[in-house]
Amino acid sequence: YMQGWDKIRDARWKRIVDLKLMQGKPALSPRGVVPESLFEDETHPLPAWDSLTKDQQTDLARRMSIFAAMVDVMDANIGRVVDELKKNGELDNTFIMFMSDNGACAEWHEFGFDKQTGVEYHTHTGEELDQMGLPGTYHHYGTGWANVCCTPFTLYKHYAHEGGISTPCIISWGNHVKNKGGLNHQPAQFSDIMSTCVELAGAT
């Protein structure tokens, strides 16, 4: 992640285009903005990665690496569940729905924050840097990386913009899914989920 949020966001956008994940002729939104405080319209521009100090870049790359590691562990363990269902012959008889409740979290600063320091950003160096991600630590990655995670949209969690509300929903249910491996651009909302599960269970 030392490449920085500008280069990585561009690379993610190119992959989205190559995979044809979006309809029409979408464009990558400009580099994001940083909300001055939660639920307020006042913002300031997100700084370019190359404008940051080396210490800031190293701290921020570590924050994103920690988040990516958590996602990787989650993915591996979801895979373990799926493998067990396959082994028991139950995968095609199991309805799996995987989704997110909102877009990436930009709290509370372009550079993130730590549980120990509250909303204030602190650049970790030396031994502090080595301790990041260990038990007892708590680091948010901030607006810069949230802008990457919401590629190609604008804004973040808390906001009724695409970056806050447009998230993937992955569904698996054997032969009940007609378009296996395909994309469906039909909008859905969390209020749809309960009624869907009730119907599938044959309940009323």
Task: Indicate where each model-derived feature is located.
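Short, flexible, mixed-charge acidic loops at enzyme active sites
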Residues: 42-54, 112, 166
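Conserved catalytic/binding loops enriched for acidic/polar residues
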Residues: 97
